Amino acid sequence: MAKVYKDLREFLEVLEQEGQLIRVKEEVNPEPDIAAAGRAAANLGKNQPAVFFEKIKGYKYSVVTNVHGSWQNHALMLGLDKNTSTKDQFYELNRRWDKFPVPPNVVKREAAPCKENVIDKDINLFEILPLYRINEQDGGFYISKASVVTADPEYPDDFNKLNVGTYRIQVKDRDRVGIQALAMHDIAVQLEKAEAENKPLPIAITIGNNPLVTFMASTPVGYNQNEYEFVGALQDGVPMDIVKSDLYDHLYVPAGSEVVLEGHIIPRVRTVEGPFGEFPGSYSGARLQCEVKIDRITHRTNPIFENLYLGIPWTEIDYLMALNTSVPLYKQLKETMPEVVAVNAMYTHGIGVIISTKVRYGGYAKGVAFRLLSTPHGMPYSKIVIVVDEFVDPFNLEQVMWALTTRVHPGKDVSIIENCPGMPLDPSTNPPGMHTKMIIDATTPVPPEPNPRETQLLDPPDGTEEWEEKLKELLKNQNR
């Protein structure tokens, strides 16, 4: 069975043991040092480590960043060998996905580390959290890696409708934060229902979690699918521990969270939020967004504040929303199109997608692309969809480029679809939230399409596999 982590602390221990965590012992400034280190870690190019700051000027606790920021850390999160390939991680996630749902364990308050300390008077977020601007022109201090818990106000006791999502959070005052709830997000559905009755929406903002909680909070699953039950599935059937919110009986938070901010979204109130350096690698402008009143804070003793850097890809955010965007889309396509082999939606949260499929008949590849563009995530997010043959690895960009350069007839195989939904944080949307989409069919034509010339594939010479193994062994002995 794969390694299972109770909380962030257990995962950090394993990262350190595996050489995937760097400790910074000298005192650093919150700004610009924490964000600069997050960017620098991403720039290392391979085996990018988490960065753990032991001493932050003006703050008595520690900070960690880049926890999910490499394929090695991603593999360790799944309890795999750190050198497991991206493609193999995709198929392992796909296997575990089928174990959903695995209901969580609800523990008593006294058994939950997140309840060790309570602040319910004179709340001051500026004293409790090591706040800083992540990018220089951010409109304020941001919490960028929280897992936010809300419930459907129409069905508050329906656990399947409990939502755990990741949304950017701007700290605005001692006990107030702004939160971005875009129309395509589950939290926006719940907020709309609450505001229709002019009622506050209860909320719990959890910081520093089991890495799979953070992973699932960034994953596009169905509205009636509970993220905690997916965590249990990805833990290979081992349920996670949750505990009831102090303020709201129908909200549950991870028992091992480092910090939990409990409060409510104020109904029908919008204030300026942003600008903020977003995941596409550019600033999104200021917008009117909802505001949260924080009424209670619980935290572990000596809490670890976890945040992430967002910048020009790739940075930690790109690893955190890569395969967990790919697998749900793959599952949805596979339901009606069993010929689909794999989906690579790792680029900018699925704005760009590569699909590998066997082509059943003429025009089939385009149909697969349209199906992806009609999924709950693909409809607002995906803009460019490339479809390749089943023998092309969508995770190998060299193979994908080969397919593009040898299979695509620009006059026939490129489809442009105008007036579609678009991700408003994508800087190329105009107006924000509307887009033109593109499908590129890079598959080999099949009847009734006309057959192209000279597309018989070259088979490797006999003995190639044996020579691969022989050369590996010779290279290994040579480097001793």
From Swiss-Prot:
Obligatory cofactor(s): prenylated FMN; Mn(2+)
Induction pattern: By 4-hydroxybenzoate and 3,4-dihydroxybenzoate.
Chain positions recorded as Mn(2+) binding sites: 163, 185, 227
Alphabetical list of Pfam families matching this protein: UbiD, UbiD_C, UbiD_N
Temperature dependence: Optimum temperature is 50 degrees Celsius.
Record's catalysed reaction(s): 4-hydroxybenzoate + H(+) = phenol + CO2; 3,4-dihydroxybenzoate + H(+) = catechol + CO2
Quaternary assembly: Homohexamer.
HAMAP family, alphabetized: UbiD_YclC
The protein, known as: Phenolic acid decarboxylase
Source organism of the structure: Sedimentibacter hydroxybenzoicus
